[in-house]
Swiss-Prot record:
One of several proteins that assist in the late maturation steps of the functional core of the 30S ribosomal subunit. Associates with free 30S ribosomal subunits (but not with 30S subunits that are part of 70S ribosomes or polysomes). Required for efficient processing of 16S rRNA. May interact with the 5'-terminal helix region of 16S rRNA. It is found in: Cytoplasm. GO terms for cellular component: cytosol. This is Ribosome-binding factor A. It comes from the Bacteria. Belongs to the RbfA family. Keywords: Cytoplasm, Ribosome biogenesis. GO terms for molecular function: ribosomal small subunit binding. Its main location: cytoplasm. Monomer. Binds 30S ribosomal subunits, but not 50S ribosomal subunits or 70S ribosomes. GO terms for biological process: maturation of SSU-rRNA.
Length: 120
């Protein structure tokens, strides 16, 4: 079995991060972290999972801006990685960090409740 999709996914992750940091000049884009990239076996689609700091409205706005600039990023990726056909980019919000933060908060609450001495 080939590891090419995994290598392409890593290259796409690196290039998209560089494009967001240096080429996309929209001030509405906040602090964006690319948490992962999944590429189909035939390299026709690439799901790019992002985490965005801020409110839900800000996250949706950032996602919309990135999706609108996906065509430009696709052409740049095709040029930089030298693929015959650059995959179509699909941006998705990664909420796993939010879930992890919420679980940590719940565990902290439980620990602080158990640490309180009970008066019996």
């Amino acid at each position: 079995m080939s590891h090419r999709p995994e290598r392409v996914a890593e290259a796409i992750k690196k290039e998209v991060a560089d494009l967001i940091r240096n080429d996309i000049k929209d001030p509405r884009i906040g602090f964006v972290t690319i948490t992962g990239v999944e590429v189909t076996r035939d390299l026709s689609f690439a799901k790019i999972f992002i985490s965005v700091m801020g409110s839900d409205a800000h996250r949706q706005e950032t996602l919309s801006i990135l999706q609108k600039s996906a065509g430009y990023m696709r052409s740049e990726i095709g040029r930089r990685i030298k693929l015959r056909h650059a995959p179509e980019l699909i941006f998705k919000l990664d909420t796993s960090l939010d879930h992890g933060t919420r679980i940590a908060e719940i565990l902290h609450e439980i620990n602080s409740q158990e640490a309180k001495p009970t008066h019996e």
